[in-house]
């Protein structure tokens, strides 16, 4: 009986298509290996299979990056059609309202062998910048706002606006360079993002530090680290004099959630960036290029920002999110976003 609706992230989708091609896969989660045949059976017996527009953009880009051609993307595109027809599975693409993959345009151009590669890469780039910018600003602002509140300082709202504009301009410069040079690796992009985060943070702290001193407080000096590592070390140093500083930051985040809920921000979006904030403060985890992609995937079920290609409304309670990426899996599990323990337990072999 076809009764499951499954949302595949990028690597789960590629895993499925390669399995169809009978390639060898060795993927594991929580030290348990994925049972390929069970995963394949679940997908071919699903009611609906979903992927997001950003998965298509990512596969399109990887095809260009590896071969300078769309052949690999075309293969996966053809595999979707074959899979649908072979198993009578409904296969739909979830598109963010501002990040839709223009599938009809691609199909028309593909038939004529005239795919405008630059157009699709630019669409991916623009949307990616928007998502990474959103994460950077939210994480950076949550930290700066907390520090201002912690030391009794009032921040003007125009301060946020200016920082947001600067961040977007610099991110565009970084992404233009990355997507113009096929030799550049994700590690280069990630380093540039961390440097940008550090730039924003330094400017924000330089803005509030004089006011902290005016209020009679001493701001901790942190040396030899920058970016998210600086943030983690700063909080660890604050903890020496205030054992509850991490707890206070968590309470600050809860206050932001309440404020953003009133503004209509979706719950999945908030869960993702709050987890990102906490990982940054608690462990110094960096914001990376792929976080923008992950962010768009995990928030794609929010009805206010999604366009789906199905005829009926999608009940998110009936959807299972499948990912074999450790970070995304942990997010889905920890935050209970489209997570099914029973489904994953069925997919995996016993612990090694």
Region roles according to the model:
Residues 2, 10-307, 311-317, 326-352:
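Active-site-proximal, substrate-binding regions of enzyme catalytic domains
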Residues 321:
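Conserved SAM-binding loop
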